[in-house]
């Protein structure tokens, strides 16, 4: 059900976001406690401001209210994905090459399911990370079909 809702919302949101020269990063539909939340994440090369989030929220809310494709009452939240932006699309991974990323896998690779390191390359099927373990550096390859979650990682 949740996946279907996100796909429907993406279809509504994509033209609105494109019209405003923005990028649709992700859509989440989750239940927290008794409430449903529809979260729409937008971005652009220059980032997004509150006015852009408000414009998308207003237009998307009107479109969703008109068609009413979601069976529950929900809270709509349009925002930037933040510094730890999720990596979902091929373009996201390509743009993240050379940056710090955090990867979670469905099953262990070399005994681990969580990896954080520099994304060295992405070829569409495999991610190559450079991990720093204490003072040693280690390269690891992770097949995309094993990736459960990927995001940019902020390091201090």
Swiss-Prot record:
Pfam families in the cross-refs: DUF150_C, RimP_N
UniProt-listed InterPro entries: Ribosome_maturation_RimP (IPR003728), RimP_C (IPR028998), RimP_C_sf (IPR036847), RimP_N (IPR028989), RimP_N_sf (IPR035956)
CDD domains: YlxS_C (cd01734)
Subcellular localization, as worded in the UniProt entry: Cytoplasm
One term under GO cellular component: cytosol
Keywords: Cytoplasm, Ribosome biogenesis
Superkingdom: Bacteria
NCBIfam families reported for this sequence: PRK00092.1-2
Entry's family note: Belongs to the RimP family.
Listed PANTHER family: RIBOSOME MATURATION FACTOR RIMP
Name of the protein in question: Ribosome maturation factor RimP
Gene symbol of the encoding locus: rimP
